[in-house]
Amino acid sequence: MEKEDNRILLLEKGKRKLIQIVFGRTGIIIVSLIVQILFLFAGFRYLEGFLPYFWGGSSLLSAAVVLFLFGNDDNPTIKLTWFFILAILPVFGLILYIYIKTDLGHRLMIRRYNDILAQTEDLAPCADACPSEELPEGLRNLATYLSSCGFPCYRNTEAEYFPLGDDAFDVMLDELQKAEHFIFLEYFIVKEGYMWGRVLEILKEKVNAGVEVRVMYDGTCAVALLPYNYPKKLQKLGIACKMFAPLRPFVSTHYNYRDHRKIMVIDGKVGFTGGINLSDEYINLSSRYGHWKDTAIALRGDAVRSLTLMFLQMWDVSSLHFAPESYRQYLDIAQPPREKTPGYVIPYGDSPLDRDLVGEMVYLDIINRANRYVHIMTPYLIMDNEMVTALTYAARRGVEVQLILPHVPDKEIAFSLAHTYYRRLLENGVQIYEYEPGFVHAKVFVSDDRKAVVGTINLDYRSLYHHFECGTYLYEAPEIANIERDFQQTLTHCVRADYELLKNDPFLRKLIGPAMRIIAPLL
């Protein structure tokens, strides 16, 4: 029986890997490479007399594309990646570039998203949002920038930090039980198991009690985690459900425009975000990668309004009908009286559909304004030159820059890529630690005991450029002390990375890392 279960598990794993390849850019690149090899072979075999014209035409085409790339405003690192692909695949590299840049499969999504934002951008502020002129000098510039992107700064909000998904889950269940009007869930991953089962039990109870419940999860879940018709199953239970951007072979790229956000909103009064999804590994009931270190944050008060608005906007991106006039009933919520809470809170989102790199700008602002320390937890380290330069410059001007990453990787390629950045960071005084008990999935920045971010945004190209993300920025809030305390506690379970660690890396890791770094911006 056990052998049969293992065989089924291996088949499912193989099926999932195959589907990911078919849906992803990897599949496109492999097919392009095979076709080009066949094309070149045919050229050599049957068109020997025309080869000079072929090479001449290919060279002219490549030169034209290179000139076009020089003229556009893409990130320079991404441009270099395309130069490399075009050098190897001069003809089909162009086809791949056009396929990804025109993105025909997502044109409707892009138009709809921009239309929704245009019609709802004035809904973000509330009466208690803070005017920029009243903000402390250390917050004013960043708050002004985020406000221009649709994310106002709030007071009258209590933040509660959770150093583990296990801790957050109990509170999430308690708050779900208190729901009286509506529950909104938006998650990158929903997977059947104990965690989702407990949540679903409460959702069914609340639906029967007349509470409106909406669930949205990313389309990648349908690859191997949930049945493709799972939304219909939930709808039969009275739960409104949408799958964001369902995957379609060669129409949608596997990595583009994924909804990587994690948002739970209850009655517009309590909101959760952070690194945890609705799957058992996030509360350490599954241990494929050792102990799962993740974090979350709960907001109670006015700032929940921004999380609610972000959810409603993304929900309508996947809807056939859009009714912005209905938003008010979920946004204009009378908050219960509470003691005045010091500090400021800015929930914010990031989108791959505009030119505002909100997630990266927030991180860079923290790093560049740090005076004493910047402490970071991130599962992945696949950065552009701007981020590397900011980290190294901060360390060289005397700021303590410490990074905590996993010691047990969930993706070998990502882990190998992270190690390619270690040497430059170490040479410039950045301290790197790896969490020895297992995998760090937390996305946390904390600096100078004054500012912190807890959210979904990794230090990699996917999060900073290709995904929908969200985070919560805290300034002079009491909970920042608990975030820093958790960082220091986590350090006690880490091994410090040094040149010896890099020297002892397996040969394959040393080979894979530099090779994959060439195309890292597209991964």
Predicted ranges, named:
Residues 1-361, 365, 369, 393, ...:
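N-terminal localization/anchoring segments of enzymes in phospholipid and broader phosphate metabolism
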Residues 188, 380, 414:
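Glycine- and other small-residue-rich loops at beta-strand/loop junctions that grip anionic moieties
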Residues 294, 377-378:
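A short, conserved beta-strand element enriched in hydrophobic/aromatic residues
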Residues 360, 367, 388, 401, ...:
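A general structural signal for well-ordered alpha-helical packing
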Residues 380-402, 406, 411:
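Helical hairpin unit composed of two closely spaced alpha helices linked by a short loop
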Residues 399-459:
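C-terminal structural cap/anchor segments
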